[in-house]
């Protein structure tokens, strides 16, 4: 995980003993001290929370997750438990949940797999194998089909070029290949799209999209919308959006999870928790710019209770 916006520790400096004691006290006896739980979980980095879990188990002989499960409930519990996982473990659990049982929640597979770096994909695959004793790739293959399966399997290879160099000639060639594979023929040749969208660096893709605009006179998004549909379209558009501006993509996902009637709490939790130490500050700025309101304010008006308090604390 890139730590360019890592959450600072508590002002007094991180003290794992004190935190473990405080959490134990918060869960002891009658009632639960939710404020103490919120303060510690939201005010520590992911690595520090791992240390607290280990310390807690060593000191009290109990798993902190199990203790919190018995003390908390609802979306507050879900968020607290999400914060106790390493980011790769939490993403792996989200993917497994999206696939298990009847039906598959493709939007979760797309959001997670289309937005991660090679290193993050590899960590998620390892966590999945460790937690569920199964291969993520095999499960994705078994749970998806057709061209969506192909692009997700391509992404699981973690084979994207992550260099900074831009090859203008390649951008022009890729733009032409994308045109020939989509608008330039009957039906769409998804292999060309997969090859380009799953393997080129984000910088290279931006050059390709520009070349496409010049060559064809329309946005790559427009072409994708005309040529594809359903989940495949969602996956391609997510890859394009993320190459252009991943923070913008997540800002929009957050906005859509809250606007209108009802709130998609799962998406809200997933994005706030998984982006907290990656690009949440940038997402907040983008959200403000796009919607003329702060993400914290919208979360405040859309959630309640301790769930709201924990999310708002994570957003600061």
UniProtKB/Swiss-Prot annotation:
Keywords for the protein's UniProt record, in alphabetical order: Annexin, Calcium, Calcium/phospholipid-binding, Cell membrane, Cytoplasmic vesicle, Lipoprotein, Membrane, Myristate, Repeat
Family assignment from sequence similarity: Belongs to the annexin family.
Gene Ontology BP annotations: cell differentiation; negative regulation of Golgi to plasma membrane protein transport; positive regulation of Golgi to plasma membrane protein transport
Name used for this protein in its record: Annexin A13
Outcome, altering residue 73 to C: Slightly increased dimerization. Decreases calcium-dependent membrane binding and location at the cell membrane
Domain remarks: A pair of annexin repeats may form one binding site for calcium and phospholipid.
SMART domains from the UniProt entry: ANX
Compartment annotation: Apical cell membrane; Cell membrane; Cytoplasmic vesicle
A GO term for molecular function: phosphatidylglycerol binding
Topology within the bilayer: Lipid-anchor
Main location: membrane
Signal peptide limits: none
Keyword presence, Membrane: yes
Tissues and organs where the protein is expressed, per its UniProt entry: Detected in epithelial cells in colon and jejunum (at protein level). Detected in epithelial cells in jejunum.
Disulfide bonds: none
Lineage start: Eukaryota, Metazoa, Chordata, Craniata, Vertebrata
Gene: ANXA13
SUPFAM superfamilies: Annexin
Pfam family, one: Annexin
Cellular component GO terms held in the UniProt record: apical plasma membrane; basolateral plasma membrane; cytoplasm; cytoplasmic vesicle; exocytic vesicle; extracellular exosome; extracellular space; membrane
Keyword Endoplasmic reticulum included in the entry's annotation: no
Lipid-carrying residues in chain (N-myristoyl glycine): 2
Mapped Annexin repeat ranges: 14-85, 86-157, 169-241, 245-316
């Amino acid at each position: 995980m890139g730590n360019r916006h890592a959450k600072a520790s508590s002002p007094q400096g991180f003290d794992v003993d004190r935190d473990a004691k405080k959490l134990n006290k918060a869960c002891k006896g009658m009632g639960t001290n939710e404020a103490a739980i919120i303060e510690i979980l939201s005010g520590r980095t992911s690595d520090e929370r791992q240390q607290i879990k280990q310390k807690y188990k060593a000191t009290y002989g109990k798993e902190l997750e199990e203790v919190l499960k018995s003390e908390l409930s609802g979306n507050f519990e879900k968020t607290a438990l999400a914060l106790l996982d390493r980011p790769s473990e939490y993403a792996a659990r989200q993917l497994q949940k999206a696939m298990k049982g009847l039906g598959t929640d493709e939007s979760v597979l797309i959001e997670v797999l289309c937005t991660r770096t090679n290193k993050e994909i590899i960590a998620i695959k390892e966590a999945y194998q460790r937690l569920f004793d199964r291969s993520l790739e095999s499960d994705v293959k078994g749970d998806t089909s057709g061209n969506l399966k192909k692009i997700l399997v391509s992404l699981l290879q973690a084979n994207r070029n992550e260099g900074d160099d831009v090859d203008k000639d390649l951008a022009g060639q890729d733009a032409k290949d994308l045109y020939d594979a989509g608008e330039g023929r009957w039906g769409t040749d998804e292999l060309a799209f997969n090859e380009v969208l799953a393997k080129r660096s984000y910088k290279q893709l931006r050059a390709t999209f520009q070349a496409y605009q010049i060559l064809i006179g329309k946005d790559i998004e427009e072409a994708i919308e005309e040529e594809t549909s359903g989940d495949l379209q969602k996956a391609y558009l997510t890859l394009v959006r993320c190459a252009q501006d991943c923070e913008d993509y997540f800002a929009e996902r957050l906005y859509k999870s809250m606007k209108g009637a009802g709130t998609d709490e799962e998406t809200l939790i997933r994005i706030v928790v998984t982006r907290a130490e990656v690009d949440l500050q940038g997402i907040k700025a983008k959200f403000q710019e796009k919607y003329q309101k702060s993400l914290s304010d919208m979360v405040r008006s859309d959630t309640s209770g301790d769930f709201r308090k924990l999310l708002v604390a994570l957003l600061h």
